[in-house]
Regions:
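N-terminal Sec/SRP start-transfer signal
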Residues: 2-43, 56, 61
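Hydrophobic, regular-secondary-structure patches
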Residues: 43-119, 144-145
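Short aromatic/hydrophobic contact patches that present stacked aromatics
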Residues: 69-71, 148-150, 216-218
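The feature marks short, hydrophobic/small-residue-biased sequence motifs that occur predominantly
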Residues: 102-143, 175, 198-201
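Short, solvent-exposed hinge/capping segments at secondary-structure junctions
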Residues: 132, 151-165, 207
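A residue-level structural signature of the nucleotidyltransferase/glycosyltransferase Rossmann-like core
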Residues: 147-148, 196
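Short conserved beta-strand and strand-loop elements enriched in small hydrophobics
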Residues: 161-177
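Mechanotransmission and gating elements of multispan inner-membrane complexes involved in transport
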Residues: 172-238
Length: 238
C-alpha cells in the first residue's frame, strides 16, 4: 500500500460535460449527414444514368423506325432501274428482316389553305405494314389505295390535318397528285414527325415520272450487332 500513488480526480463540472456531449453529438450527426450525402449522390447518379440510358434507347428505337440498318444507293445513277431483282437477291441472305425499296423526294404538301415542304417517301403498302414499326395514333397504316398518305403527328398538328382530309402533294417538277390522309403516325423523333409524308411507292413513281424505279433500298436485319457480316454479303449480291 505504501508504493501506491494516488491521484486526485478532478471533478467534472456540468459545463465540461455539456461541451464534451455537444462535440460527441455533433460528430455523430456529421457522420450521419456525410453518409446521407453520399447515399443521395449515388442515388441521383444511378437515376440519372438510368434515365440517360432510357432516353438513348428510345432515341435509337425512334430513329430505326424509319432508318434502316443498311442503306443501298446507286453510285452510277440517281435511280435503281431493276430494283426488284436486287431486292429478291438481298432477301435470300440469312439474317435479313426486311428489304424496303423506296422512292423519296423533297416535295410540297398542301391542305387546309396551308403549304409545307416535306420529304415524301414512297414505300410499298406491304413494307409499310410489315417492314416499318410505325406507331399509328389515328387512322391506320393501310396505304393499299394509290391516293393514300400517312403523315407525322407534328406535321398533322401544324397543318390541322385529320384522317380523311384530302391534300395535294407537289413534286419539285411541279407535278401534283391528290391524296387522302389514311393515318397519322408518331415515331418520337421530331424530324420524322414534322417533315415526313409516306405514300405508296407507285404513287411516288407516277409523281416523279421516272417509271418503275427506286432511289434507295433500305435493309433491316434481325440482329443489328451482326450487321457488318451481313453488309459484306449484301455487297456481293448487288
Amino acid at each position: 500500500m505504501k508504493n501506491l500513488k494516488w491521484r486526485r480526480v478532478k471533478k467534472v463540472t456540468m459545463v465540461e460535460f455539456f461541451i464534451a456531449f455537444r462535440h460527441i453529438i455533433e460528430r455523430k450527426f456529421q457522420s450521419i449527414f456525410s453518409v446521407l450525402g453520399v447515399a443521395i449522390a449515388v442515388t441521383v447518379f444511378i437515376v440519372s444514368l438510368t434515365v440517360s440510358n432510357g432516353l438513348e434507347k428510345n432515341m435509337i428505337n425512334s430513329l430505326l423506325t424509319m432508318s434502316p440498318h443498311i442503306l443501298v444507293k446507286n453510285k452510277k445513277s440517281k435511280f435503281f432501274d431493276n430494283y426488284e431483282g436486287t431486292v429478291e437477291n438481298v432477301k435470300k441472305i440469312k439474317g435479313i428482316k426486311a428489304v424496303i425499296p423506296q422512292m423519296n423526294s423533297q416535295s410540297i404538301l398542301k391542305g387546309n389553305g396551308l403549304a409545307k415542304g416535306v420529304l415524301a417517301d414512297g414505300i410499298s403498302p406491304e413494307n409499310v405494314k410489315n417492314g416499318l414499326n410505325l406507331k399509328i395514333v389515328d387512322g391506320n397504316n393501310n396505304i393499299s389505295e394509290l391516293n393514300s398518305v400517312l403523315v407525322g403527328e407534328q406535321l398533322a398538328t401544324e397543318m390541322n390535318l385529320k384522317v380523311g382530309n384530302e391534300i395535294s402533294l407537289v413534286s419539285a417538277e411541279n407535278k401534283e397528285i391528290k391524296l387522302i390522309v389514311r393515318g397519322i403516325f408518331k415515331t418520337g423523333f421530331l424530324d420524322y414527325d414534322s417533315n415526313l409524308a409516306i405514300v405508296p411507292l407507285e404513287a411516288m413513281q407516277i409523281l416523279s415520272d421516272q417509271g418503275r424505279v427506286a432511289t434507295e433500298i433500305g435493309i433491316k436485319v434481325e440482329h443489328p450487332e451482326k450487321v457488318e457480316g451481313i453488309l459484306s454479303q449484301v455487297r456481293n449480291v448487288i
